[in-house]
Amino acid sequence: MADRDATLWASHEKMLSQPLKDSDAEVYSIIKKESNRQRVGLELIASENFASRAVLEALGSCLNNKYSEGYPGQRYYGGTEFIDELEMLCQKRALQAYHLDPQCWGVNVQPYSGSPANFAVYTALVEPHGRIMGLDLPDGGHLTHGFMTDKKKISATSIFFESMPYKVYPETGYINYDQLEENASLFHPKLIIAGTSCYSRNLDYARLRKIADDNGAYLMADMAHISGLVAAGVVPSPFEHCHVVTTTTHKTLRGCRAGMIFYRKGVRSVDPKTGKETYYELESLINSAVFPGLQGGPHNHAIAGVAVALKQAMTTEFKIYQLQVLANCRALSDALTELGYKIVTGGSDNHLILMDLRSKGTDGGRAEKVLEACSIACNKNTCPGDKSALRPSGLRLGTPALTSRGLLEEDFQKVAHFIHRGIELTLQIQSHMATKATLKEFKEKLAGDEKIQSAVATLREEVENFASNFSLPGLPDF
């Protein structure tokens, strides 16, 4: 019995020390396949990026082992002195990265990601069934900003709060601030959200703040997509005008998957007659909404990864990278325009563009599937004026990930031509099908036609040969 227990215990110790490739060949194989897909493919999904080796090392550290419910100095567990040190360092760097005075701003770095961060703000500042206004999802907003259809409330935000979206002009794709102002005066929201997931122009934060002030509302910026650009100072910052700013940390900021909530603190206003000061109470409201309101223990390994990313975001190299992201996006937009494609709003101020395929006679869902088969990853997206979200007309394309791999403007001109050839192939497939053929039938034709598969293979080989010339950031084994 003792010999058997000793053998089992030795086997147990071996299990704890084995590398992944020996411990779990199936998971290791999947990771290797995904690593190869990223290496040989062109990643154009605007919300994706390639985290640095240092960020991934922090993410895979022993910090994963530690529970630490609560906040620095106020934990519900012992053994958290170094966790406190880490979280306070991350908070300090977050304020430094965005040039914020710690007397006027605070930050919570515990949200698990952007969606929980947003919901924590709503929970903190808007009573149940209180009113929220965000950019409509089909017009470039995010699901968490209150999306619902005529028949169904989709996002939990629209279930637990009353949501009224604001819109863009269908003709230009630009936000209709006049209509927002008019609707806000009737709806009287408690919170207005300045944030997007597919909008290629800078937001008018000053105009949004005035609308918020006129209606006694808070203004919250969701800068998830542009947080790296904001840190580098290459796009307008929301901090001058907003009461609260939320963000993810894995898009243009190029960290691991997590979220942050910045909030104003200190003096909010001074009575001109009495001189009495009124103070912000956002800190306690937001912190209690994150924990214990919506979350348990923070993910300390992720907080470490965020801290590393924030340090990198304060470097000259990071600013050069973000400037290149913008230059590459302009190059991609210009090249596609020259090839005859319509870009919503006519261009971009940031890291993404939305390509409208209606004039070409196809849609985003079909083009996405063909491009994916050719090792080009992007995503279908609704365009202003789309009749159905089930058949979006556009493709959203972003430059952060490929810029992290070292692609420059001339490289994105080649990428544009690869995209063009993929869409031409999409149209070729459609020409051999009924006008009302479903997406399912289209995918069957794409997968089952030998001639089409041969054309796909030819383009895929060219794409993969091109992409393989650029290194992939991250851990060397993966």
Swiss-Prot record:
UniProt signal peptide: none
Keyword field contains Transferase: yes
InterPro entries assigned: PyrdxlP-dep_Trfase, PyrdxlP-dep_Trfase_major, PyrdxlP-dep_Trfase_small, Ser_HO-MeTrfase, Ser_HO-MeTrfase-like, Ser_HO-MeTrfase_PLP_BS, SHMT-like_dom
Cofactor: pyridoxal 5'-phosphate
GO MF annotation terms: glycine hydroxymethyltransferase activity; mRNA 5'-UTR binding; mRNA regulatory element binding translation repressor activity; protein homodimerization activity; pyridoxal phosphate binding; serine binding
Annotated EC: 2.1.2.1
EC category: transferase
Entry superkingdom: Eukaryota
Similarity comment: family membership: Belongs to the SHMT family.
Protein function: Interconversion of serine and glycine.
Assembly: Homotetramer. Identified in complex with FAM175B and the other subunits of the BRISC complex, at least composed of FAM175B/ABRO1, BRCC3/BRCC36, BABAM2 and BABAM1/NBA1.
Record's miscellaneous remark: In eukaryotes there are two forms of the enzymes: a cytosolic one and a mitochondrial one.
HAMAP family the UniProt entry points to: SHMT (MF_00051)
Protein name: Serine hydroxymethyltransferase, cytosolic
Native species: Mus musculus
Gene, per the UniProt record: Shmt1
